Amino acid sequence: MSGTLILVRHGQSEWNLKNLFTGWRDPGLSELGHEEATSAGRKIKDRGLRPDIAFTSVLSRAKVTNTHILEVLGLPALETIEDVALNERDYGDLSGLNKDDARKKWGEEQVHIWRRSYDIPPPGGESLRDTGARVWPYYLREILPQVLRGKTVLVSAHGNSLRSLAMVLDGLSGEEIVKMEIATGVPIVYRLNPDSTVASKEILEG
């Protein structure tokens, strides 16, 4: 057995609450989001997991989630690396729009295609494939080597950046990954083999 990878989608943001496309915009966590992030920390602690290093995007909702988790674990000064590579998918022209308003403007079917297709981006934005093209190389270069040294690594990021990791770790197709839901504030724990394959996966829902 090698190391452990803990993936956490940030707690609910103010814009999740308002049903807005967020992408690279930078709203804070909602009241529930702060609670979800703290709860994620408790779930990790209850499993006896103790991160050796943390990674997060440069967006505040992920950074604050990471901070809450580390505070619960008694590790407020843990080394944390922030990188734009872990940012949420860029929704381009949809960013900041209410999802219902976007459906009125472009049509329900078109918005559904942009949201749930693997390789069709919204205007000025990224597809899930585009997101994976920056997330996965970063994982291979920066995160995986830490795990293969036997470390426990915490990654606090976003629905689509984490989907991009789960797609490869779980061996999912583009069609399958767009249907995968990643809940806010629910840790996903992967234990990796020395050859970087997945030995086990556990979702800490309880």
UniProtKB/Swiss-Prot annotation:
Catalysed reactions, as listed in the record: (2R)-2-phosphoglycerate = (2R)-3-phosphoglycerate
Q: Which GO terms describe its molecular function?
A: phosphoglycerate mutase activity
Where does the record place the catalytic residues? Answer: H10 (tele-phosphohistidine intermediate), E88 (proton donor/acceptor)
Any one Pfam family here would be His_Phos_1
- Site Transition state stabilizer — annotated at H158
Keyword Isomerase listed: yes
Q: How is the subunit organization of this protein annotated in UniProt?
A: Homodimer.
> What protein does this entry describe?
2,3-bisphosphoglycerate-dependent phosphoglycerate mutase
The scientific name of the source species is: Chelativorans sp. (strain BNC1)
